[in-house]
From Swiss-Prot:
<keyword id="KW-0863">Zinc-finger</keyword>
<keyword id="KW-0832">Ubl conjugation</keyword>
<feature type="region of interest" description="Disordered">
    <location>
        <begin position="858"/>
        <end position="889"/>
    </location>
</feature>
<keyword id="KW-0694">RNA-binding</keyword>
<feature type="modified residue" description="N6-acetyllysine">
    <location>
        <position position="515"/>
    </location>
</feature>
<feature type="compositionally biased region" description="Low complexity">
    <location>
        <begin position="394"/>
        <end position="404"/>
    </location>
</feature>
<feature type="modified residue" description="Phosphoserine">
    <location>
        <position position="621"/>
    </location>
</feature>
<feature type="compositionally biased region" description="Basic and acidic residues">
    <location>
        <begin position="209"/>
        <end position="227"/>
    </location>
</feature>
<feature type="coiled-coil region">
    <location>
        <begin position="828"/>
        <end position="852"/>
    </location>
</feature>
<keyword id="KW-0862">Zinc</keyword>
<feature type="compositionally biased region" description="Basic residues">
    <location>
        <begin position="169"/>
        <end position="186"/>
    </location>
</feature>
<keyword id="KW-0597">Phosphoprotein</keyword>
<protein>
    <recommendedName>
        <fullName>RNA-binding protein 26</fullName>
    </recommendedName>
</protein>
<feature type="coiled-coil region">
    <location>
        <begin position="724"/>
        <end position="800"/>
    </location>
</feature>
<feature type="compositionally biased region" description="Pro residues">
    <location>
        <begin position="334"/>
        <end position="388"/>
    </location>
</feature>
<dbReference type="InterPro" id="IPR039511">
    <property type="entry name" value="RBM26-like_RRM2"/>
</dbReference>
<feature type="compositionally biased region" description="Acidic residues">
    <location>
        <begin position="973"/>
        <end position="1005"/>
    </location>
</feature>
Length: 1012
């Protein structure tokens, strides 16, 4: 049988534990006492309980654990924790003990009352308009409460009971019934003790205590000076409003006081008794230790520590949302107004009787007679405390405070207005505020129409915004308020701000849209999204390293996406900027959406070019705006073209400026296009840019002017065809130059290969005693060189200008006319039975030339079927012919010539037009004897399209095969001669002969547009 610890009085042991633990423990003694009591209650032997307590309490007490546990068990065994049994009964003991304690406290309060009056005699000058004795009594009583808070050890034996949360909940529910509580913190100690005694006794004892409670001076009694006098009679016109209808919560009420203080000298409030169901008959009679109220929260209306604060904020704390507190504007407050009592139907707001800060100045009194208790104010009125946007009055901050207060204390203020649907407040900036008293010049903007009182509704608590940091102790204002004072309307929900024009010299904080970093041009994340249409072909590059910002590097990268029309490096004076213009929008879009890093540098940024960017940069440049400083600053939209373009270039410019204006030098890279640098300068009258010279700086600025471009297009619409021809001619010449460069490079590579081949052959001939391994390696190298030399020769031959330039003299119309005439003559002679051999050869040559130039249409000939394929271009394996890239840029070493057989003599004339519909034909050789033809297409993709779709001709199948120029590779499988179209398609795509070429060289030279 395990002997259990016997504890006679748990509450007494808990008090003993609290007192014993306080000096040796950092934790809350009352909470730790509960924990120790729970450990001792366990159903174990004394030895086990000792071990358990030592183990569990070592974390809290450490070195003192062993001593405390021994002392605890000694106290339990000897019952020394029980109070000495002097009283005959426990009930009379408790009553006498509490009455004795109450008398001692009253005596202390009476002796200290005079000290309180002396201590705060300075602050009585700032008291609200009320009776001096009442104010002194309330102030001293409040100070006594604060002072008594510090005596924590006196009440450590009275920790909060377990049902404190339930009591608080009951008190909160009691709000809606007939229980009244005070919102203020001015309860005296005797009232707190009376309340707890009410809970522990019967209703008759509660009534006795309520009569004792009536000895305390009521809250709003302004006629008596003796706080213990009990002849209180209400004098207010609203005194008949019972507290049962309008309850005022107690200290621990769920409504937290952030509203303004009381109003009117005759506002009264009665105290009611506790309801019977509020009395806890089973509770212990000692007064519980209430959780300390947060001083910052009660004085300011908020606490910066929030949930981390160890003090009580009440059951309904104000939550300050995540607002940028230091960045808001400082807002002055509305002036106080001393008017009548609150309207009937609303409870009088309770006072907050905490002492004001030392540096608090009284507000400006309104017009009218001052209360007799307030001394007259002389001199200029001091500035008003700042008003929070939620409509609550706040005192000015001290110099050391970082956050303004929300609720003023001890000062008679005007109550806030009734909250509208959107909590708005009208306020003025510092030094330009209006007193909002009666203004004879503008009586319509007085403050008399605003409601004087509002009932605090939990659902309509406004957010606390507009809290700002800084020193708000403003100097007194010497001048009367001006009509043009700046006024701001703040919507606390949408938080929009509109700022009007104020007096000159009033310095205010810069708002978010006035800051210099707002809406910068180079910050793409904050700009308004612009929907670019299909007409934009310009790309803008930023952060290009100077060593990479040159024409050759940029052209090498961006020419893969399409035809470059314009390229400017160091664009707009930025050494790390560039401007790229493509021929079409699709090419520009393909370039900007490419996942590949520009020039292998991931820091280079590519943006769509905005046409207004250059103009915006120039208008915001200080050099260009310099002549306009003396003029009134207008929005950019209202400026004229001359103002946007800057000063007009004068006739007498400096030599350096004249040189830069008249001659397009190569070093002026930022302003010249590719055509200008190559020597093809267009007419200056149709230029979309204009040179603007600033004689003060000696710099040239290129400004894009869309209006000038439109005007030039209207006035010079007659000369646009000639301009288009010039542009086309320039493009052709540029393409020709690039083609010549490519051909020159190929020629150099070919010569090197030939030299290497000769050297290897001579080495083989001279060295007869060479090892077989070395000889085999040299032979292998020679074979590869021979293949490459043959390919290069074919490519150089195909790109030779002599083959196409003499024939390009004829125009398209002339070529079509000559082809039709020859075809007609051939038809007539064949009908007449004459010799047509020479005429047929001429007709074939014309067909070949027309096919090369793309003139030969797919619909010509005698009933040629298009087979539903539509256009002649774009077929194949999806490779296409590029997007404006010249044909010389595509280097494909696979065979492009088709060997065609199995056609009749009558089909010979229509054979070339049949295959011309699949692509551009470079060469055509037809053997009349064997009826064998070799047709060479310009690209491999076109040849593949012709091989796949052109095998069917006039209802019969042609035999198609790739024509291979190298003899040892010319062996054709017998399967290739099969007429089946699907079989030929499979062979043409999978055959090893298509994969025999050098893949690396193909990747280096081929256009990569198909990879996008």
């Amino acid at each position: 049988m395990v002997s259990k610890m016997i504890i006679e009085n748990f509450e007494a042991l808990k008090s003993w534990l609290s007192k014993t633990l306080e000096p040796i423990c950092d934790a809350d003694p009352s909470a730790l006492a509960k924990y120790v009591l729970a450990l001792v209650k366990k159903d174990k032997s004394e030895k086990e309980l000792k071990a358990l307590c030592i183990d569990q309490l070592d974390v809290f007490l450490q070195k003192e654990t062993q001593i405390f546990v021994e002392k605890l068990f000694d106290a339990v065994n000897t019952k020394s924790y029980l109070p000495p049994p002097e009283q005959p009964s426990s009930g009379s003991l408790k009553v006498d003990f509490l009455q004795h304690q109450e008398k001692d406290i009253k005596k202390e309060e009476l002796t200290k009352e005079e000290e309180r009056e002396k201590k705060f005699s300075r602050r009585l000058n700032h008291s609200p308009p009320q009776s001096s004795s009442r104010y002194r009594d309330n102030r001293s009583r409040d100070e006594r409460k604060k002072d008594d808070r510090s005596r924590k050890r006196d009440y450590d034996r009275n920790p909060p009971r377990r049902d404190s949360y339930r009591d608080r909940y009951n008190r909160r529910r009691g709000r809606s019934r007939s229980y009244s509580r005070s919102r203020s913190r001015s309860w005296s100690k005797e009232r707190l003790r009376d309340r707890d005694r009410d809970r522990s006794r019967t209703r008759s004892r509660s009534r006795t205590r309520s009569r004792e409670r009536d000895l305390v001076k009521p809250k709003y009694d302004l006629d008596r000076t003796d706080p213990l006098e009990n002849n209180y009679t209400p004098v207010s016109s609203v005194s008949n409003i019972s507290s049962g209808h309008y309850p005022v919560p107690t200290l621990s009420s769920t409504i937290t006081v952030i509203a303004p203080t009381h109003h009117g000298n005759n506002t009264t409030e009665s105290w009611s008794e506790f309801h019977e169901d509020q009395v806890d008959h089973n509770s212990y009679v000692r007064p519980p230790m209430p959780k300390k109220r947060c001083r910052d929260y009660d004085e300011k209306g908020f606490c910066m520590r929030g949930d981390m604060c160890p003090f009580d904020h009440g059951s309904d704390p104000v939550v300050v949302e995540d607002v940028n507190l230091p960045g808001m504007l400082p807002f002055p407050a509305q002036p106080p107004v001393v008017e009548g009592p609150p309207p009937p139907g609303l409870p009088p707001p309770p006072p907050i009787l905490t002492p004001p800060p030392v540096n608090l100045r009284p507000p400006v009194p309104p017009p009218g007679p001052l209360p007799p208790s307030l001394p007259p104010v002389t001199g200029p009125p001091p500035p008003l405390p700042p008003l929070q946007p939620s409509g609550m009055d706040a005192p000015p901050n001290s110099a050391t405070s970082s956050v303004p207060t929300v609720v003023t204390t001890g000062i008679h203020h005007q109550p806030p207005p009734a909250p509208p649907s959107l909590f708005t407040a009208v306020f003025v900036l510092p030094d330009t505020y209006d007193t909002d008293g009666y203004n004879p010049e503008a009586p319509s903007i007085t403050n008399t129409s605003r409601p004087m009182y509002r009932h605090r509704v939990h659902a309509q608590r406004p957010n606390l915004i507009g809290l700002t940091s800084g020193d708000m102790d403003l100097p007194p204002r010497e001048k009367p308020p001006n009509k043009s004072s700046m006024r701001i309307v703040v919507d606390s929900e949408s938080r929009k701000r509109t700022i009007g024009s104020g007096e000159p010299g009033v310095s205010t904080k810069k708002t978010w849209f006035d800051k210099p970093n707002f809406n910068r041009t180079n910050s793409p994340g904050f700009q308004k999204k612009v929907q670019f249409g299909n007409e934009n072909t310009k790309l803008e590059l930023r952060k290009v390293p100077p060593e990479l910002n040159n024409i050759s590097k940029l052209n090498e990268h961006f020419s893969r996406f399409g035809t470059l029309v314009n390229l400017q490096v160091a664009y707009n004076g930025d050494p790390e900027g560039a401007l790229i213009q493509f021929a079409t929008y699709e090419e520009a879009k393909k370039a900007i959406s490419s996942t590949e890093a520009v020039l292998n540098n991931r820091f280079i940024k590519v943006y769509w070019h905005r046409e207004g960017t250059t103009q915006q940069l120039q208008t915001t440049s200080p050099k260009v705006i310099q002549p306009l400083v003396q003029q009134p600053i207008l929005p950019v939209v209202k400026q004229s073209v001359k103002e946007r373009l800057g000063p007009v270039p004068s006739a007498t410019t400096e030599p350096a400026e004249a040189q830069s204006a008249t001659s397009e030098l190569p070093q002026n890279v930022t302003k010249l296009s590719v055509k200008d640098r190559l020597g093809f300068v267009s007419k200056p009258s149709v230029s979309a840019t204009e040179k603007v010279l600033s004689t003060s700086t000696g710099l040239t600025k290129t400004v894009y002017n869309p209006a000038a471009l439109k005007a030039a297009q209207k006035t010079l619409s007659v000369s646009t065809p000639a301009v288009d021809n010039n542009e086309a001619q320039k493009k052709k010449q540029e393409a020709l130059k690039l083609q010549q460069d490519v051909r020159k490079r190929k020629q150099e590579i070919l010569e090197k290969h030939i030299e290497t081949q000769k050297m290897l052959i001579s080495k083989l001939e001279k060295n007869k005693t060479m090892k077989s391994e070395d000889k085999a390696e040299i032979m292998k190298t020679l074979e590869i060189l021979t293949k490459n030399i043959t390919k290069l020769k074919d490519e150089v031959k195909s790109t030779s200008p002599g083959r196409c330039l003499p024939k390009s003299i004829k125009t398209k119309t002339q070529m079509q006319k000559e082809l039709l005439d020859t075809e007609l003559d051939l038809y007539k002679k064949m009908q007449a039975g004459e010799e047509v051999t020479e005429l047929r050869r001429k007709y074939t040559e014309l067909q070949l030339e027309a096919a090369k130039r793309g003139i030969l249409s797919s619909g010509r000939g005698r009933g040629i079927h298009t087979r539903g394929r539509g256009t002649a271009h774009g077929r194949g394996r999806g490779r296409g012919r590029g997007r404006g890239v010249p044909g010389h840029a595509v280097v494909d070493h696979r065979p492009r010539a088709l060997e065609i057989s199995a056609f009749t003599e009558s089909d010979r004339e229509d054979l070339l037009p049949h295959f011309a519909q699949y692509g551009e034909i470079e060469d055509c050789q037809i053997d009349d004897a064997s009826l064998h033809a070799i047709i060479t297409f310009k690209t491999r993709a076109e040849a593949e399209a012709a091989a796949i779709h052109g095998a069917r001709f006039k209802g019969q199948d042609l035999k198609l095969a790739w024509n291979k120029p190298i003899a040892n590779m010319s062996a054709v499988d017998t399967e290739e001669a099969e007429p089946d179209e699907e079989e030929f398609q499979e062979e043409s795509l999978v055959d090893d002969s298509l994969l025999q070429d050098d893949d690396e060289e193909e990747e280096d030279n081929e256009s990569r547009s198909w990879r996008r």
